[in-house]
């Protein structure tokens, strides 16, 4: 067996249909489009019209809805953060903006740090959520966790603290997120 003897499986490759190239080809004249009407013309065809058949959008039931208050949470493990530290990509302080840049996640609402992996050096991480194991490992390495909230209302809702207390606690840090200007 050599390269010149290789052939595709029998019946797997067909010649291209050259439509509208004369009646002798079997696909000439109307080129397989039938006679006249919207579907014989070039361009867009109405996809929903199925003739007398009940269309698919009526055969299938309605279900679900799109939540307007849906928030996206991007997770990141300590393993990844440790790799960034070793490579010198980040300093010993990580903020929400750093996560957005490094993970290419500008559309993410929240970041959650998970505990997979180990942290060997003290690091200060600002994120919206931390798993218990991640908090413990960061504290054990001599680091600090700061919970970032986008609004005071979020600080109260998530932590269940009165606003004054929330502002006094070291764990709560307000982060202003600039909305991107729409580009034309």
Swiss-Prot record:
InterPro entries (alphabetical): Ribosomal_uL15, Ribosomal_uL15/eL18, Ribosomal_uL15/eL18_sf, Ribosomal_uL15_bac-type, Ribosomal_uL15_CS
Q: Which GO terms describe its cellular component?
A: cytosolic large ribosomal subunit
Q: Which GO terms describe its molecular function?
A: rRNA binding; structural constituent of ribosome
Biased composition, class Gly residues, residue ranges = 21-35
Q: Name one GO biological process term.
A: translation
- Region (Disordered) location: 1-45
Entry keywords, A to Z: Ribonucleoprotein, Ribosomal protein, RNA-binding, rRNA-binding
What is the similarity comment for this entry? Belongs to the universal ribosomal protein uL15 family.
Subunit structure and binding partners: Part of the 50S ribosomal subunit.
Describe the function of this protein: Binds to the 23S rRNA.
Q: What is this protein called?
A: Large ribosomal subunit protein uL15
Q: Please name the source species.
A: Chlorobium chlorochromatii (strain CaD3)
